[in-house]
């Protein structure tokens, strides 16, 4: 029972790991002894975040930038990760959103969101299955954690007509993948975050992407009276990645301060 929540020595890939929720999870993994790869579309940002996280938390944080909205980028990332001998944890966090009024909502916006949030998750998981299969055992399965959203459970507040739909699809994809892979010692679950101080939420509430804004107006509307913290999301990801979470399969777990429960 002593090491129930240990991820010491595990190898993890966190997509969308250069900022926001992905960065929070990557930081939590590093602080608890995992070797972490982070990926994002912008190489300079990804490199800078990996360097900063490694300096702050120690361990090994490796930047592997790629665009995961298309198969070329997915294949390139899988090839980079395959240079390691195995992969214990895959966090599919890379995501996109697009906001326009319904009468103006474009095919470009629809496809960008669906390609990144649904198709990209499936095909990256597919390409990394050999490594995940190699790492997983009956006692300590490999883990896939898909980052969904409460907007895939309840109606969202913004004119992002493909975002919530993509996350609802991701939640169902999580169940399908979990049923398919559980007997191969690969466990798949999803986390549905609520409000966290991220670039994406900041753009939606008029903050222009600045994460250092006053979040109290958002936090005050939350049942817990605040927005989420890195400890909240990283703690849940660590649970799902550790021995403690080895019997939790195919679930979408909200991390939202009670928003969905109170809606």
Q: Where do the model's predicted regions map?
A:
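Short, small/polar-rich loop/turn modules that mediate ligand/substrate recognition or access, typified
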Residues: 182, 187, 248-250
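Short, flexible catalytic-loop segment of classical short-chain dehydrogenase/reductase
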Residues: 193-203
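Alpha-helical segment proximal to the catalytic Tyr-Lys
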Residues: 130, 179-180, 246
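Conserved glycine-rich cofactor-binding loop
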Residues: 11, 18-19
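Catalytic loop of short-chain dehydrogenase/reductase
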Residues: 137-169, 174-183, 195
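Substrate-binding pocket helix/loop in short-chain dehydrogenase/reductase
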Residues: 101-102, 106-114, 218
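Short C-terminal tail/terminal secondary-structure segment
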Residues: 2-4, 238, 243, 249-263
